[in-house]
Regions:
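Boundary/entry segment of secreted carbohydrate-active catalytic domains
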Residues: 1-21
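Conserved radical SAM core fold
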Residues: 67-68, 101-107, 210-217
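Active-site beta-loop-alpha junctions enriched in small/polar residues
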Residues: 14-16, 34-39, 64-67, 98-99, ...
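Acidic-and-aromatic substrate-binding clefts and catalytic sites of carbohydrate-active enzymes
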Residues: 18-19, 36-46, 67-77, 146-154, ...
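Acidic (Asp/Glu)-rich catalytic clusters
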Residues: 21-27, 44-61, 77-92, 128-133, ...
Length: 231
């Protein structure tokens, strides 16, 4: 399964940005990222606009709902549809959150996976299933969380490392998520990053967040990136 390396800065591809981007993509933008779930059943003008961009610019897919850490079987119809979408648009890289987001139905939020050996084996097997179906390596993204699951046998960084090794997949490093978690749960963000297998990183997320009145930091991607995250 091939590895994929990205260079330069990317931008999240949103429909509301299309009119401005059609007039010219800034030279600083070297690739775009999109959530395939938002485009799989898209037709008409929006589909044509997307095609015009994927023909001229590199894209990556960043999934929202594969539920890698969940107990419900992997949605193979979704994986098949994502694979066809990637082939249609010439997209080489797919990433997903290292989290769970549903059981009998979709919960529309991302929840942390317990840091246990059993969860490592369970999640890694599901990642391998997805990679086999897609015929390519995928990357998993470290997620933000606000309550840590009980019964941890591994540190969060140790859990991520173990899943990456067991599944033989790559890492989509979200620097803002590391910062948010470090502030909310009281650990050293740089030490956390140093514990990760950085040779597996395919690209990084830089984003903003919101600070609640009580000091809790929420990962919203709705504000400017602050200096400590850049650092």
């Amino acid at each position: 399964m091939p590895r994929h390396a990205l260079q330069g800065a990317g931008l999240g591809f949103r429909r509301e940005l299309i009119p401005e981007l059609e007039s010219g993509v800034p030279e600083a933008i070297r690739f775009f990222e999109l959530a395939p779930e938002n485009w799989l059943r898209m037709g008409g003008r929006s589909a044509k606009q997307l095609r015009a961009f994927t023909e001229r610019h590199p894209f990556v897919c960043h999934g929202l709902s594969l539920n890698l850490g969940g107990l419900k079987p992997i949605d193979t119809e979704l994986v098949t549809a994502v694979g066809a979408f990637m082939h249609e648009h010439g997209i080489g890289l797919y990433t997903e959150h290292l989290s769970w987001c549903g059981d009998d139905g979709m919960l529309y939020d991302l929840f942390p996976i317990p840091c246990t050996g059993e969860a490592v084996r369970h999640t890694a097997a599901r990642i391998r299933q997805v990679q086999e179906m897609l015929g390519r390596r995928i990357a998993i993204e470290n997620a933000s969380y606000y309550v840590a699951p009980p019964g941890a046998e591994l540190s969060e960084a140790g859990f991520i490392r173990a899943v990456l090794e067991e599944a033989d997949c790559d890492l989509h490093l979200d620097v803002n998520n590391v910062y948010v978690n470090s502030r909310n749960h009281g650990f050293d963000a740089l030490a956390f990053i140093r514990e990760l297998p950085l040779e597996r990183v395919v690209y990084m997320h830089m984003a903003g967040h919101y600070v609640e009145p009580d000091g809790l930091i929420i990962d919203t991607h709705g504000a400017e990136v602050i200096d400590p995250v850049w650092a």
